[in-house]
Amino acid sequence: MQGGNSGVRKREEEGGGEGAVAAPPAIDFPAESSDLKYDESDVPAELQVLKEPLQQPTFPFAVANQLLLVSLLEHLSHVHEPNPLRSRQVFKLLCQTFIKMGLLSSFTCSDEFSSLRLHHNRAITHLMRSAKERVRQDPCEDVSHIQKIRSREVAFEAQTSRYLNEFEEVAILGKGGYGRVYKVRNKLDGQYYAIKKILIKGATKTDCMKVLREVKVLAGLQHPNIVGYHTAWIEHVHVIQPRADRAAIELPTLEVLSDQEEDREQYDVKNDESSSSSIVFAEPTPEKGKRFGESDTENQNDKSVKYTTSLVIRDSGELESTLELQENDLAGLSTSSIMEQQLPLRRNSHLDDSFTSTEESSEENVNFLGQTEAQYHLMLHIQMQLCELSLWDWIAERNKRSRECVDESACPYVMANVATKIFQELVEGVFYIHNMGIVHRDLKPRNIFLHGPDQQVKIGDFGLACTDILQKNADWTNRNGKRTPTHTSRVGTCLYASPEQLEGSEYDAKSDMYSLGVILLELFQPFGTEMERAEVLTGLRTGQLPESLSKRCPVQAKYIQHLTRRNSSQRPSAVQLLQSELFQTSGNVNFTLQMKIIEQEKEIAELKKQLNLLSQDKGVRDDGKDGGVPV
């Protein structure tokens, strides 16, 4: 080895000089560089390392993963906190914590994804339920824990509602015999809508399909004087009732009003739920109703006492607990007259007589003796165009101004032109729905709205024809089984309902014409007090009219008498009313022509503006051609 080395050194010395070439090294190392380069020839394109400084990679499914994590957090919040209000607060707190930790983006926690999280939550619930069923082996094991978990699941499912997840409830706008109307804000588009919620009795699949078909017909109405219907859907409402150790209770109806109370309710409806909470009970129908406090000795054993009472619990800061039921889900419904599911809850030795649901309530607060029964009633939701000013509000404001005016000649409080415009648009809307084969059956100032700066008339709150499966808020019959005069036998308030409606006989489109006659009187006759109004409107049934109205507005008075005739066949139709002298007087014609002239002037101004823009564009193009260089 030493000799070899000396030979190499000798050859190097002999070949030394400036032109000598050094022998290549045995291993060729690349030059040092701050950016390491790798052989990427065999690496797929989607996995190649970027040449830029190392960054946390972002994948297309990162948002989906975060949404799933947010859905899991919401699911855990609902399971561990049954109270809807507090569970939402817990969910928001968890989201804020995960956002601060950098595990979530605030974007994925926004309300715009609430409907998507709803589908995730349902899938998680069904997955957990299936997994537990597969793991459970012993059918004789203790079911108390399972029952508790099931009650938690019901509490969660009650909150996975389309209404609760997609809308924020702002205020109550009104209530009627079959439902309440709420002002809501859509969490996704931020727009305000009106949603009417109608409670349906225990119904079959056929009944539900009938309701949905009719709602779809209403949603298809397209007319300037009809409130726009956007969509409709059905959700479940869980009603929990005691079964074994509690007697059947005939709960007092809170919605039954006297004649005077009915009139006062018209003024106070917007402040109806300003208090902390209220409970609305619908008519109970056990086999043998007992008065509050009475016991039923026949049902003190293990026999189940089934209820069909619908219980809707409201609170100022809390919504009803509902579970969405889409139309496609109706195929799975049973054909029984009522849909119900046995739901045993934990036993307790105390049952509070005043069953309330506030933000402090939870499973620990809602305790019943023995087993309980949860009945699944249906809640129909109808999303409509928001119209906050009703004709009732307009008339009330007009009456207020009339009371403040001392000199009638100096204060034209009747405003005949405006009243005629309102009534004409109302008749045009009624003519449209009658031509579509629909009878409104509940026309009154509170169901008629004035929309926009020009106060365009909008007819809303259509009564459903299938009223036999709708859950009324009160029992309109007295103890003798006869109809009380406070309300109609079907739908509508007695002051505006036709005689055939009050008598419970057959009625048709002419029943709406009677209501139009009453509204026509209110438009042209101010009232100083509510008692005066009730007396005058009641007198219409016997053909009595105020003398001042007959002298001041003879044409209107004539048609009021025609419209309120007892014999429905003698009442004019909507098309006959539109062709009558009621809308053909010189004053009305002048007013209509003035409105058309104003509209035509606006249209002409808009066309002139468009022509100017077109001429300017043409001039710019011509200048570009002359200059040779386009701008």
Curated annotation (Swiss-Prot):
Class of this enzyme: transferase
Residues annotated for ATP binding in this entry: L173, G174, K175, G176, G177, Y178, G179, R180, V181, K196
Gene Ontology annotations of biological process type: HRI-mediated signaling; integrated stress response signaling; negative regulation of translation; positive regulation of mitophagy
Reaction(s) this enzyme catalyzes, per UniProt: L-seryl-[protein] + ATP = O-phospho-L-seryl-[protein] + ADP + H(+); L-threonyl-[protein] + ATP = O-phospho-L-threonyl-[protein] + ADP + H(+)
Modes of activity regulation: In normal conditions, the protein kinase activity is inhibited; inhibition is relieved by various stress conditions. Inhibited by heme: in presence of heme, forms a disulfide-linked inactive homodimer. Heme depletion relieves inhibition and stimulates kinase activity by autophosphorylation. Inhibited by the heme metabolites biliverdin and bilirubin. Induced by oxidative stress generated by arsenite treatment. Binding of nitric oxide (NO) to the heme iron in the N-terminal heme-binding domain activates the kinase activity, while binding of carbon monoxide (CO) suppresses kinase activity.
Ranges annotated as biased composition (Basic and acidic residues): 285-301
Repeat positions for HRM: 410-415, 552-557
Record keyword Thylakoid present: no
Site (Heme-binding): H80
Family indicated by similarity: Belongs to the protein kinase superfamily. Ser/Thr protein kinase family. GCN2 subfamily.
Subunit structure, interactors included: Synthesized in an inactive form that binds to the N-terminal domain of CDC37. Has to be associated with a multiprotein complex containing Hsp90, CDC37 and PPP5C for maturation and activation by autophosphorylation. The phosphatase PPP5C modulates this activation. Homodimer; homodimerizes in presence of heme, forming a disulfide-linked inactive homodimer. Interacts with DELE1; binds both to full-length DELE1 and processed form of DELE1 (S-DELE1) in response to stress, leading to activate its protein kinase activity and trigger the integrated stress response (ISR).
Protein name in UniProt: Eukaryotic translation initiation factor 2-alpha kinase 1
Organism whose genome encodes this protein: Macaca fascicularis
